[in-house]
Amino acid sequence: MKAKDIAELLDEPACSHNKKEKSGCAKPKPGATDGRCSFDGAQIALLPVADVAHIVHGPIACAGSSWDNRGTRSSGPDLYRIGMTTDLTENDVIMGRAEKRLFHAIRQAVESYLPPAVFVYNTCVPALIGDDVDAVCKAAAERFGTPVIPVDSAGFYGTKNLGNRIAGEAMLKYVIGTREPDPLPVGSERPGIRVHDVNLIGEYNIAGEFWHVLPLLDELGLRVLCTLAGDARYREVQTMHRAEVNMMVCSKAMLNVARKLQETYGTPWFEGSFYGITDTSQALRDFARLLDDPDLTARTEALIAREEAKVRAALEPWRARLEGKRVLLYTGGVKSWSVVSPLQDLGMKVVATGTKKSTEEDKARIRELMGDDVKMLDEGNARVLLKTVDEYQADILIAGGRNMYTALKGRVPFLDINQEREFGYGGYDRMLELVRHVCITLECPVWEAVRRPAPWDIPASQDARPSGGPFGER
């Protein structure tokens, strides 16, 4: 990818902080090889497209280090679960065999699995030696009759967020707009309900949580053409240009997709979240507002009233156990503010939140929810996290899996909230799942046990000693 193309991706007019100085390649830090590069960002953004063959063109470590980093789930095809790579070695680089290996890898994927498309992810090594991945993909598509989409996402281009944008740009350039949506199935129309087509951009169906939101949209007559990219299919991505409204779910990483769909097709968009009662209700209201359908607005308010009453009644027995508990939330991106709302719905107080991967808009949402004097953690090493826990008397640390051992060493209750988790927390009914896990974590008897002084640390008392002989006989 040329430098001017990277600069264009970094230039995002829809961001209010767009005029600030931008840095394409972040300064390397210890531990940075665990991901967070452009390749990692591009792959986790598109890997949830379940029926596509995903080929990583590069050394095998690139495929191995990033595969399955995001716990997305599919309701059908599982081809995305198969890790494919060209496994470049030193000999391939020296002898100039990298492009040939890629061509044969595409052929093997097409002949073995018959996918509707193949996504090829460029990495650092082939980018440095000058492989023409675009030309190879074009030749393979003509030869095998299957779309082959190049995703030029070499890790040294920049950060994980840039990789998300590169992935979105590839979809805009090669996929979106290449097919029209299917007509509504015969007999699926409901009298008096007009069906509206919508997209969800940046929804990854972590632990299947989107499946708990989809019934709400179906009830309102909102047909989801595509979720980019959780539980998505290639043919669905092709039809995204025909949506009436786009919802930006995962912060601003794929904002370029929403903006360009608006510029090209006039599709309005908004940013929202399905975490917590308040944010879920607001997202449904925003759909109704932008679609400008009075009947939809009335039905939306009725659904919100019903669901809120039901979930608040179910939460009432738990509230007394959680109200007033103090939370240190250390995560990034959209979760730095979207998880605050459900915790506040439970009467809990978020004393600090992590903003390492948060945009300026994310930070503005945090201040709106928690006040201007909120504690934001840009860096969260073990020392900083434990110091913050002590300083703010936090009862629980809610963070990603990599912080689990920090919490355990500090004897602090810990709940994993990041993309690797096994439980979904999106939608109204999954609030109960979040509450259950928070309660289980806080009330686990192990915390009382590990905080209790060991017997050998308790000063011996003369009165506590048995009288008499060595065995206490009188």
From Swiss-Prot:
Coiled coil spans: none
Family matches, as Gene3D superfamilies: Nitrogenase MoFe cofactor biosynthesis protein NifE, C-terminal (3.40.50.12380), Nitrogenase molybdenum iron protein domain (3.40.50.1980)
Pathway in which this enzyme or protein is active: Cofactor biosynthesis; Fe-Mo cofactor biosynthesis
Span of the signal peptide: none
GO molecular function, one term: nitrogenase activity
GO biological process: molybdopterin cofactor biosynthetic process; nitrogen fixation; protein-containing complex assembly
InterPro entries from the UniProt entry: Nase/OxRdtase_comp1, Nase_comp1_CS, NifE, NifE-like
Annotated Pfam families: Oxidored_nitro (PF00148)
Keywords annotated in UniProt: Nitrogen fixation
Chain's role: This protein may play a role in the biosynthesis of the prosthetic group of nitrogenase (FeMo cofactor).
Family: Belongs to the NifD/NifK/NifE/NifN family.
NCBIfam families, alphabetized: nifE
Protein name: Nitrogenase iron-molybdenum cofactor biosynthesis protein NifE
Gene name of the record: nifE
